[in-house]
Amino acid sequence: ITQAQNLPNNDKIAIKCGGWRRNVYHRQVLQSYDVENEKKLLNRLVDPELHKYVDHSQIIIFDIGHENGHSLGPTAEYQNELGVFKHIIEEHKANMFSIASIAELAKKEEKFTKEELKKIYASWIVETLFLRARPVFSQPHRMASLIEFNYLFENKVIWFDSNKKLHIDFDLIGMAAYRLLEETIRVQLSKTASNAKAFINRWAVWGEWSRHIADVQRELGVKPYIKIITNF
């Protein structure tokens, strides 16, 4: 779990630079991660050629980009005008900023190799876009994931073969994320709740493949833990 906290910009460096925003990241060190369950999930839902790219440790890079994304883009003045839809749109915007910026850092700054980029992309898709259940309106992060899954699928960035295994066109991810980020920011800039609602209704659809993915995950279940009984 990674979270970011904005700090006051009253230190010497921030003042000298004209007032920059600083983020502090908090990462949960002890994490519950079921390696065996993920292997089963990959065998059921992901093309074997992609297994080597799914790496749980790569999610931290996406998370940092996501938290940075909250510090950029339209301000609260615009976001608040979207009413009850603002949280879904904002979480989704942060996701797309992360993926789009990672692509730019790889292309222009050579911060990531092609293999590293594939690991980040594949891990993001499998770890966050493979939902366990249909999200509800009060779950903005999961609603955002559903939006992104459908957008990638409709734009042929991801697809499933006759064996119901995921395939990814890595070359299309960066541009798709950039286009979706542009569209999302336009929704925020519109200051119109109806635009946000229409955007969510358009993309947050619980379709055939989302249902299949959720069914498989429910079938696989979760890792059983040792039951500890304490007698006083």
Task: List each language-model region with its residue ranges.
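Post-HEXXH active-site segment of zinc metalloproteases
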Residues: 74-92
